[in-house]
Amino acid sequence: MTICVATGIVTSRAKKVSEMEREAEREKIHSNLLRAVSHDIRTPLTGIVGATNVLLEQDGELTQEQRQQLLRSTNEDAQWLIRIVENLLSITRIHNSEEARVKKAPEAAEEVIGSAVAKTQKHYPDVEVHVSVPHELMMVPMDPLLIEQVLVNLMENAVIHGGTSRIDVTLSQQGGDAVFTVADNGRGIPLHLLNKLFDGAARSDRSSDGKRSMGIGLSVCRTVVLAHGGTIRGENKKDGGACFTVTLPMKGDDDED
């Protein structure tokens, strides 16, 4: 009896320590996200204000080409803000749920990939996206909107920060996990960022427009994947470019013993 009680106490303490560690990690991610958001929101807003001020104050002196350029710049910054908001909504959806978990239901992974690819190609029509999926439909327990956002973030990151012209999205099953990979032929991940890609603080000075942070998007990816009980990692390919791998358990929470 004494041994059982002692074992129960140790187990209870271990659970509390593990819970405290998870909470500390969530707080760290949350803090880093706030810093990244404050930077990333300010940048496009400054661009929008600057462009519209020029249009309002110097409209009579501008050529048609200059006006079009200012309008394009404003539109791009507005689209950027929309994507930031989409990511913030994803994070809020998780943090507002109990224990930072998500409600999962079996979804066709191929359809989620297809939706993410369509959204990405709408924004970046010049980038080739090649998809490889199994012949048989893979039903994976997930929140489809959140996993779609993960895939969109990874593909967008490849374009903005990797400068890629081609993206390969692959779906496979390894043991009890569904494995999604997003690989590109771009510049790869800067070595000094490899160990902090997902903590919300990662910033690359090699983005296509020279100002966008990769911190928010990848941090959102990590938060979403962990809330699904999965894993995510990023690495450089030997032949150039980067590869991100996401694994999600094929077994739902209700199936666990």
Across the structure, where does each feature detected by a protein language model lie?
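Short alpha-helical Gxxx[C/S/T] motif in the catalytic ATP-binding
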Residues: G217, C221
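Conserved catalytic submotifs in the C-terminal HATPase_c
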Residues: K103-P106, E128-M138
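Short helix N-cap motif at coil->helix boundaries in the Bergerat
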Residues: A109, G188-K196
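Short alpha-helical segment of the dimerization/phosphotransfer core of two-component systems
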Residues: E76-I82
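Conserved micro-motifs of the catalytic ATP-binding
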Residues: N96-V102, M139-M142
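Short helix-loop "hinge" at the ATP-lid/N-box region of the Bergerat-fold HATPase_c
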Residues: A158-V159
